[in-house]
Amino acid sequence: MEIRTPRLILRTARPDDLEAIHAVLSDPRATRWWSSPPHDTLEQTRVWLEAMMANGPDHPDFVIELDGRVVGKAGFYEMPDVGYILHPDVWGQGLAGEAVRAAVDHVFATRDVDTLKADVDPENAASIRLLERLGFVRTGFGERTWNVGGVWKDSFFYALSRRDQVGKASAEPPA
């Protein structure tokens, strides 16, 4: 499976993505807002990548390629919850928004799902802006929803309905 945007390719993960994905998941800057601490070993990332690959077509989850280099992931590890992470070297270019928009458009075009969801740390202002720019609406707050490396994190919950997504441009980079 492959989705192309103006700058990116979102595709199914492969075993040879291991080192590139490890570069993302082992970087403390990238995982600051992630649901687990940075990966310490390549084996830890291998287990994560194998689970991503085993998820199959019912859970469209993609690695993100920029100019032939894997720089992150975006998609739906658990339907209907969207998740995304990028290597810090490519932050600030609108790539996360472009990738998430493409993944969202794909799911609404190919799945019988009415609402997509997201869970974001209230301190992650960039991710909150991204979700809101894509039309996600805050639906709630949860205290101590994630235990990441022994530290409890809160969550803002977001949702995007199919009805609100109709008519939005597909896979365009944000302005």
Regions found by a protein language model. Name each.
Residues 20, 37-38, 52, 125:
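Hydrophobic alpha-helical elements and their junctions with loops/disorder across both membrane
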Residues 42-43, 58, 152:
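Non-catalytic, surface-exposed connector residues within folded enzymatic/regulatory domains
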Residues 51-52, 106:
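A generic secondary-structure signal
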Residues 45-47, 53, 153, 172:
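A generic membrane alpha-helix/interface feature
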